[in-house]
Amino acid sequence: MAKWGQGDPRWIVEEREDGTNVNNWHWTERDATSWSKGRLRELLVGITVENEAGRCEISELKQVEGEASCSSRKGKLIFFYEWNIKLGWKGIIRESGAKHKGLIEIPSLSEENEVDDTEVNVSKKKGDGDILKDLMKTAGTAKVREALGDYLKALKTEFTMGMILPTKAMAAQELTVERKLSENALQIQASSRVALGVRIPTVALHMTELFDTAIEQLYRIFTVKDLVQKFSKSPAVLEAEKGGKFQMLMETSPVNIQNC
């Protein structure tokens, strides 16, 4: 016998959550007949279709014969189901108010055929009312097949819950994934606290202007409010003293006068 952790990887030598028939590895079968009958009744009875000619409703599940089961073998699920279903429907013609009844028969719902290929036969009792029969053959049949598809989805998901149990390695892997997701969430939360924005590089700009005039005249141009306003052709703010405000163009920001 191989020691723990040794041997061909195809050998099943590992600790499992359950002890007997580990992870249902050997053949395990669960009867789904009773569950299926109840689910088929829930999904099929009450289906309604209507158009401008009339309205029809599946009123009862007259017969459901057959069986269904789900088997587990080496971690794989195998489904078996075979049903013969008869449904009763009733309808009313809008114009005349006449009421009619009929049957829907599904002779063979099994895993051998796709739901869209499943035979659905619609019949009606003698008399008028073929427009209701046609309604059930078209829209009614489509809704019946849709309900059968919902039954098969439920059989393969809801009914099989717990049939394949996780191994110890799978459980540890799931725990690692959850831990990584939690760590990623914490990192995202931490990074979200950092102030958002884009750092823009800036430089200092120094400019020198040469004025071809006398110093006294240049001084007056920048210290006499009337001369500043004539130069800028706009109102100006001028306080010719240390710390005073100087604003030559109104749309620019004011500056403070410093010693030169």
Swiss-Prot record:
Protein's GO biological process: protein folding
Keywords, comma-separated and alphabetical: Chaperone, Stress response
SUPFAM superfamilies: Activator of Hsp90 ATPase, Aha1
SMART domains referenced in this protein's UniProt entry, alphabetically: Aha1_N
Record-linked InterPro entries: Aha1, AHSA1-like_N, START-like_dom_sf
GO molecular-function term, one example from the UniProt record: ATPase activator activity
The keyword Chaperone is assigned to this record: yes
GO CC annotations on file: cytosol
Biological role: Co-chaperone that stimulates HSP90 ATPase activity.
Protein family (similarity comment): Belongs to the AHA1 family.
Name listed for the protein in its UniProt record: Activator of 90 kDa heat shock protein ATPase homolog 2
Organism encoding this protein: Bos taurus
Upper classification of the organism: Eukaryota, Metazoa, Chordata, Craniata, Vertebrata
Gene designation: AHSA2
